[in-house]
């Protein structure tokens, strides 16, 4: 198929930067817009056109569409920290929902036909059954999940009214780093468990907090479905191809491995990979954390013929730790 120009919003961020690499590796023309509030310019390859700014800047976005001949959008820009969303809900509705409204409006006006959206398992809230199917009730329990669900609804309504199709990929817990260490999670004050744990391994932290040990799970800690960021990036490219090939079809797909790991099981993996234990401290539950989130990925596998390459927690942790050590070396220079 012809590979049309793609605009990646939030392409200097963690997941977006890996999507940029996957697109480039696949021969897609790609450009990036990022306001650098959470992203890092250095992870965007030097030959990729980069625009510093907000997706809410209609004039800038419109200019990018013209200059790059944009045919499709991969949309990662937004705020993503669950506890912060509870403290600052209006920030999340502005950055995630209102910002995407502006982006969709600009796309419709310019005739950009395909949008692939970075959604989340947080749209499901605290699910009644595991694994979670895409058709299960969406009852988010924090503003982050609610803001993403509102965006999905905007995309659905827009696709019914305008010549536009969309995909919403509902991520579970994304971790790891590009195996070639071209990109990884940089994060300022990260709340991601594996990122925090490998920071502790290299001495950036002296311990890892375990939030809640009284959940109704095997060991009392939260259970999550961890997916390697490069496997997720591959899923994005496959989903984009599907949207372009089938312009009358929309996609809503869970992105996970369908396997749950508890906080303690993940920390055990970190200890194995690091060959030494990381100190743990037990803390009360965090507001907005459901006990268990595990995907049914049947539709993802069947619809996109997606085959993960890194579906092993030790591999995920190894790549995350290698990236963290690279960051530590860069900081020391």
Regions found by a protein language model. Name each.
Residues 11, 39-41, 53, 83, ...:
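Glycine-centered small-residue hotspots that permit tight backbone geometry or close packing
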Residues 194, 202-333:
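C-terminal substrate-binding subdomain of Rossmann-fold SDR/epimerase-dehydratase oxidoreductases
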Residues 179-190, 199-200, 206:
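Hydrophobic, Gly/Ser/Ala-rich alpha-helical and linker tracts in large acyl-processing enzymes
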Residues 1-177:
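N-terminal Rossmann-like NAD(P)+-binding domain of SDR-like oxidoreductases, especially those catalyzing
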Residues 103, 155, 197, 239, ...:
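Aromatic/hydrophobic pocket-lining residues that form π-stacking "cages" and hydrophobic walls in ligand
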Residues 93, 141-149, 183-195, 225-226:
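Short-chain dehydrogenase/reductase
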